Amino acid sequence: MGNEFSGVVEEVGNNVDEFSVGDRVYCRMPLDKIGAFAEFAAVNKNALAKIPDYLSFEQAACVPLTALTAYQSFDLMKVKENERIFISGGTGSLGAMAIPIAKNFGLKVITNGSAKNKERVIDLGVDEFIDYRTQDYSEILSDIDYVLDTLGEKELEKEFKILKNDGILVSLKGMPNKEFAERMGLSSIKKVLFGVVGRKFDKIAQKKNQKYYFLFVNENGAQLSQVSKIFEQNKIQPSIDEIFELSEVNKALKKVDNGESKGKTLLKIN
């Protein structure tokens, strides 16, 4: 178990020149080798990146999964400078990463959430904030270039509504579709299966020549290195909720499962 980690390089392979013993590194674990809840992990160099100097190990451990999710979403969209993106529910931990990364891509960022979080996301760079308790974004916004969906199926139709003709929606919690299966190189049977489960949203997108993508984040050291540069330039401060010892792993997992975390919940392995 464990999707991401920060730590120190203890050994390197014979053909590794990019990293040295003692380097501070972080990583989104490869999908076939999830296992960050451990004292040591053997990881392909192509999944690793060096930690920005200003981040502690604890802060760095918060970064890879959510930051890569945001980065890969914008990469999939092929975003262009000065265009508008709506990030649904952008006041959470993903938004805290996605907003400054979106600004680094030159995007104009709109998000919604609770009014108590308005100032915090404005400080992150949001250009327009919508209080979901008093305003319905689907009645306010239109002709949006991109939507990053973090809420899932119950919001997707409203998100398509605000998207311009030929706009692009990337969902992190919707249904995978055939395009996702093809992009991920999945089996023929999964292409058929995902083609069925994602058909509803493909059809909605086709009405206005829009594009619907489902994203499941992959390990990518080169992209994570770009994230490191963005963090270094902007001095982004990851949000930590609580740090547990490895012996408290069940307590930590329960907290996350119950949705009680207001930032990242970490395990510290001594």
Which positions does each model-derived feature cover?
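A short acidic, Gly/Pro-enriched loop at the edge of an enzyme's catalytic core
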Residues: 139-146
